[in-house]
Structure formats: C-alpha cells, structure tokens
Amino acid sequence: MLRLLMIADDFTGALDTGVQLAAHGIPTQVVVGQADLSACSSTVLVVDTETRHLPAAKAAKAVEELTRSAVENGVGCIYKKTDSALRGNIGAELAALLKASGARNLPFLPAFPQIGRTTKKGVHYIDGVPVNESPFGIDPFEPVRCAEVTKLIHLQTEIPAQNLRPGETAADKTGILVYDAATAADLETAGRQLFQNGTPPVLAGCAGFAAFLPELLGLSDGSVVETPQLDPRLLVLCGSVNPITLRQMDTAEKAGFTRLRLTPRQKLEPGYWASADGKAALAEIEQMLAANPHCIIETNDAGGNQLTADYAAARGIDLDGMRVGISGSVGQMFGALFGSEHLGTLLLTGGDTLLQCMNSVGARELEPVCELESGIVLARFTYQGRTRYVITKSGGFGQEDLLVELADRIAKH
C-alpha cells in the first residue's frame, strides 16, 4: 500500500530523498514523469516531475495534477521534495501542492544541517553563507537570488508564507510555514511536534527532514540496508558546473584519477557519437577505461567554459540549449559505452546528466539502496536481465576528497 508520495523536481534529488526511507528497508520506488498511483505496489513512491527548469506555471501544473491524483487514491502523506539550495520553482510548486491538497497549511523545512545547509531566522545558509552569496548564487543555469525563504516563495506565489522559529506550533496557522533549523535535532523536534496529533497530509523539505520520516510515519523496523559489493573500477561522469564538484575532480586528478574533458564539438554537435570521429573517440575512451581503474569524463572546459560558450554562440545555441544539448550528448556517449567490459562502478553527478544517461539505456525507474555518504546515493536498476548499480550525486554535495574516499571505500569493501 502506498503510504507516502514524494514529489521531486530532478532525478538526483528524487534519489537522495527516497534513499532516506529505502536505507531502512522500506520498499521505495523512484520514477520519472507520469506515475499510476493506483497501480503502485511500493510503500513509498518518489516521482521526479523534471520541473526544475520549466516555467513556473508548467511546474505548478505538474505538481497540482500529481497531488490531486494522490488525494483521489487515498495517499496518507505527500512530501514535496525541494532542492536543499532552494533552486527551482520553489514558490510555484509549494503553492500548487497546498492548493490541490486542500490542506490548511504546508509545513516547509528546507534545511539539511547534516551537510551544512541551515535556516536561521528565515534565512537559508550554505556552510554559514547566505545561499545567494554561495556558489549557488552564481549558478549559470539557475542562480538563487534570494536567501530569505519567504521572499523567495513570494517571487512565484501570493499565498501567505511566514517563518516559524524552533518551538512554534503550526496548529493555528495557514499558508506556507517555513521552519528554522540549525541542527538535525531541530528538524527532529519540529517533526515530533508536527506529528503529535497524527500524520500531516502535506509536508515539504529536502533529504534533511526526510531522514526522520521513517520513524515519524512508523515505517521503520530499525533495520539498515548493507552496502553490496561493487566493482572497484570507478568511472565518474560529470555534467555539473558546480564549483564544489570541480574541486572534487581537481583533488581526484591530483590523487591519480585519469581525467578527460569533452570538447565543445563532442558536447554540442548533434549526432556526434554516431559519426566516424565520434566512434574513434569512443574507442579511445574504452582504451582509457581499460588502462586506468579510476577515470573522470567531464563536460567542463579547462579554466572555465568560455570555449564551449563561444562554440555555442557561433551556432546560435542559447544557454538552455547548451544545457539540454550537453546532457543529451553525454547520455548518447553513455549509451554507447554502457556495454563495455571495461566499465566498472559508475558515479553520475548532476540531475540532467543522470536522467539522460538512464534514458539512453531505457532505465526510467531506479531503486535507491543506501547512502555511501550523506547525499551520495547508491541505486540499482535492471538492464537486460542484470542488476546494475550506479552512484548518484548532486553537484553541490560532498567534501573535496569525496571521489578519492569513495574509490578507496569501494576497493576495500
């Protein structure tokens, strides 16, 4: 029976939140796009609506339709998963959930203190820095312009939104209620307060608060899923421009990872990987994988992305066209390489990259297994009758030595 519906706006976010329940042995399914809630056999269903880059009205419509379906099918709790750095259509999607559910209010707990993302006096911080002054404020595709959460919400909706401090009750309030949380304990306290009179019909937040849902919903039996043995060879496929991920790759390269940067043509020329030059490049990549146990293939140019920007400008490709074109090309490359005997464990970073790579091998559903580190998810899917594993990561997650530490951990497990 479906007990919990989670609605995410990108693939990596769907996984890093769904795994908070799957890691406790709770049957959890992650799907992209449309979902038949009446036919779902999992206890938890996470739907990635792929609305992060859509216009606000279209994003709201997708969330509203899914919410109405959940209400009609008697789903007890709906959780709107938001980005922990507040990217995407936050106000529009929260308003759509509240409106379609018919609930009196929507408790919103945006913090993820476990990885340094906190909300204090209504302002959202990344490692102590207001989010709009952090790397997320200069994201080329979706910069976060405002750190005051209620103001950010009101950029897209007129529904009332107010900030709640630790200890304040939501019982007599209406609209979107933004909770402060500087620690995981703050989230836990807020959760216990919210659930003391039964399960709230709607909630919103990221993986930080979702970590407490197994206990709050009475779904956890105390079990913990063990990490399966993985192929010690590691290929990192990076489509993220986040400075955090760039530093992780620099650190890994210094530690001995082999690093390949795709050229502007490889990233943006339609059909490149099916061309003679593309096939030759794929053969060279296979040779690289055969000769090196730890490899990185990335979409960033050395020293910035001006080369790719110039290439795109000369061909009339705008910023969104670059984003779609690059992720699509990476997906095509991934599909061509996927059957290689030299391919070991995969780590995909960036939601667009993950989606296109999974599309290329026909995997529209993933099952989260466990977290290797906070925000770093191990998931599995079936390909030609075999279980395959993939590690997924949002571009903004992890310490600088993350890739090196993961490679060591996989090799020793």
Where are these regions (language model features)?
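Cap/lid and interdomain-hinge subdomains that line or gate substrate/regulatory clefts
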Residues: 1-4, 27-31, 43, 59, ...
